[in-house]
């Protein structure tokens, strides 16, 4: 049994969905239909889809009517409007995802409903409005992690918006050909001994013959380029997932490139982590939602949690929302105490960043 789902964008003023109960055949008499919520159906949906949606709390939604009638000789009942309030700050801060499992809970006259077709799971897609710092090579973020790491599986996520990405392959602006803006590193961490094969996560735009608008990751002595040609001043969600055998790059939740790995542990020392901390990083980068995992996350996890996630999720080692709006210190939402600071300050803060891109 599976249930249909539908995503609902919930803006600052809330949202309204409509439900129209219908019969599979012309009603031979009046049929009274009652609507409500089915938490059990949401549990089944979560199990089958690998999600962990919480039911919207009581008082955060309302039906304009719960009982409607399919008249004799008709197929459908009057439409029911369900009003949904915006998610509260507490709900947003939790990182949990919410849904409204609307179901036909009763039908008069012993009429039967088609199991699975009597439920609709409305997935709440709350518009998140946040702030984020602008970084560059002279104003990076450096981390002091709580420990060193030796891992066979890991994942890294971030949202990023680059102000300038070259489309040439020359060393710099002063050389013939279009600007390349090579080796613009947006994240790095390493083993501390300078031997890349022992560890290293090095993510950059541009590499010699690789144009500056192409993303590349180096790890364990090998590297792979993304297929996407990135654009200036556009938000992207990036995820890099290592399952111990293969590295996968996701761009906006979609698989972009893969790389076979040498199947050995990755070593990273705690003071080697940094964002936009390379000398070649000369343009501005707005960065948000940086997460480091000690497990390989799934594509559905990536797609369902681009703008927020529960900080207590298993395997989430560090989570910097970078939404403070001011200052040079950034909180690790997991509570693990992984420190992130901008020792030279940030270029500026950008406010009013919306998850719906408006």
Language model region names:
Residues 125-132, 200-262, 348-358:
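Extracellular glycan-interaction surfaces
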Residues 118-135, 307-358:
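Extracytoplasmic low-complexity segments
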Residues 128-212, 297, 301:
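Extracellular glycan-recognition modules
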Residues 258-286, 311-315:
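Flexible glycan-contacting loops in extracellular carbohydrate-active proteins
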Residues 88-99:
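Short glycine/proline/serine/threonine-rich loop/turn segments at secondary-structure transition edges
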Residues 43-68, 219-220:
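Short beta-strand and strand-turn-strand segments in soluble, beta-rich domains
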Residues 144-156, 227-234, 280-286, 310-313:
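Extracellular/lumenal carbohydrate-interaction signature centered on repeated Trp-anchored short motifs
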Residues 153-164, 281-305, 317-326:
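Extracellular, beta-strand-rich glycan-interacting domains
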């Amino acid at each position: 049994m599976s249930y249909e789902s539908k995503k609902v964008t919930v803006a600052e003023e809330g949202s309204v969905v409509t439900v129209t109960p219908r019969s599979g055949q012309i009603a031979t008499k009046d049929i009274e239909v009652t609507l409500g919520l089915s938490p059990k159906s949401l549990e089944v949906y979560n199990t089958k889809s690998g999600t962990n949606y919480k039911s919207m709390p009581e008082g955060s939604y309302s039906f304009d009517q719960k009982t409607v009638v399919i008249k004799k000789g008709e197929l459908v009942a009057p439409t029911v409007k369900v009003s949904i309030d915006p998610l509260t700050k507490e709900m947003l801060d939790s990182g949990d995802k919410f849904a409204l499992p609307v179901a036909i809970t009763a039908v008069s006259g012993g009429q039967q409903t088609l199991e699975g077709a009597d439920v609709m799971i409305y997935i709440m897609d709350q518009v998140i409005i946040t702030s984020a710092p602008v970084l560059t090579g002279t104003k990076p973020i450096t981390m002091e992690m709580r420990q060193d790491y030796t891992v066979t599986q890991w994942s890294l996520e971030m949202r990023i918006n680059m102000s300038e990405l070259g489309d040439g392959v020359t060393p710099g602006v002063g050389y013939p050909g279009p600007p390349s803006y090579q080796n613009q590193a947006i994240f790095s961490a390493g083993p501390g001994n300078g031997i890349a094969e022992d560890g290293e996560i090095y993510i950059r735009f541009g590499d010699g013959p690789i144009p500056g608008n192409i993303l590349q990751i180096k790890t364990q002595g090998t590297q792979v380029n993304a297929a996407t040609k990135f654009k200036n001043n556009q938000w992207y969600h990036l995820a890099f997932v290592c399952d111990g055998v293969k590295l996968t790059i996701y761009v906006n939740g979609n698989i972009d490139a893969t790389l076979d790995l040498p199947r050995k542990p990755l070593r990273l020392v705690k003071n080697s982590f940094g964002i936009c901390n390379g000398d070649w990083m000369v343009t501005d980068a707005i960065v948000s939602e940086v997460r480091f995992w000690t497990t390989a996350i799934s594509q559905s996890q990536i797609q369902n949690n681009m703008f927020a996630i529960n900080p207590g999720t298993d395997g989430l080692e560090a989570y910097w929302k970078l939404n403070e709006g001011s200052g040079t210190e950034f909180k690790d939402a997991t509570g693990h105490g992984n420190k992130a600071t901008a020792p030279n300050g940030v270029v500026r803060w950008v406010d009013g960043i919306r998850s719906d891109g408006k």
